[in-house]
Amino acid sequence: MKSIWRRRDFLFQSGGGISGLALAHLLNQDGLLAASQPAACDAKAKGYNPYAPKPPHFAPRAKSVISLFMSGGPSQLDTFDPKPALTRYAGKPLEGKGEVVVRQGNPGPLMPSPFTFRKYGQCGMDVSQLFPNLAEHVDDMAFLRSVYGKSNDHVQATYELNTGKIQMGLPSVGSWVTYGLGSENQSLPAFVVIYDHRGGPLGGPANWSAGYMPAAYQATVFRSAGDPIIDLHPPAEIGPERQRDRLDLLAKLNEIDLKNYPGSSELAARISSYELAYRMQGCAPEAVDLTRESEATLKLYGMDDKTTEPFARQCLMARRLVERGVRFVQLYHGGLGQQNRDTWDAHDNVKENHTYHAAEVDRPISALLTDLKARGLLDSTLVVWHGEFGRMPISQKGVGRDHNPGTMTVWMAGAGIKGGQIIGASDEFGYKAEQQPISVHDLHATLLHLLGIDHTRLTYLFNGRNMRLTDVYGELIPQIVA
């Protein structure tokens, strides 16, 4: 610990402070050195490199993942899992399902969807009126209608979808993927999070933390508004030679400590993070520069519409990142603010809430799938859409819906997945997963499998135990991996 503080003292005393040297988002405790003269985008990492490409356990179907996280919990009943029984039994209590546990207030009567559904594609998939653009892709999408979670609390449920457990402090799925496979681009982070312009999700950075792993495996946060990467450039008075000299000197100090404490994986990861920050100077600005896109592409995503522009920007950045070898990109839609307005948390009015939020994402997500397919990237990219839980078939406050971890719909596309299929089913009211219930561990095991990773073999030794993303659970979803 003393040597770490000496390095910090050196940084401050050498002028400019950490803010002038750091990519603050890459390493919260120490920051990362930046350079005013960037390294080449194909530069190789020096010394120990946690991002070095690692061989998969078997031939992968996907190289990258784009996770589309709809914060707040979209309603499966009003999007991709229609329930005619809700119309037949509208206004009646939900019976025969045991104790009905709600998050707020008392259980209301059964409430039909305020949205109409129609069939799309050669497969005849039912999709609500909320997603007219996305519905055109159903033949490339697999709908998992029986995914369930353990908590009806936003924070706990979000942690579960990201880490497999409802408590904080564990490595996220993106961290596990980075740890298991490394990165195909040594000048960009392997794991990137881009959250909503209104703010990050409930639970904050613990959702993309590396937990008990070295900090190098946590996500790098890119902003969806303004400069995507903060603190990328040092102060103008610090020239490239001076900056490079500082980086080299700091690396030497770290190397001395690494020799004295060879078991310090955190220190080794910190050294590699400094080098990554230096290399990012060259290619990160280009990777997120949307002005390089054609007018037709910008319009396709909805950059010309103030409603769709924020999430269009996130989706377009995601495509550019996976195109450049970034392994795991997670986009959050719905941010902190007024929870019932700024997220999919439709306690008050599901029609008003979901109409508003679906309009923000329908066109951009549709464009993302179109663009990936046109560029030949969809076969090597797994796209996953979900929230933290589903919603209740009973009403809340007359026209809203409460949280429901009992079932939700997740869809997947790309990675050679057979599209146009429905996997699993919820009960007649959409209250509980009934046919082929799919746990979050099953979801994670399947995601890792598509990347060529056996979830039972991907382990990290912590406190004397070989830890897994899926703990001692997790079954592959056969229709997805077939």
Task: Annotate each predicted stretch with a short phrase.
Residues 1-482:
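Ligand-binding pockets and gating/stacking loops
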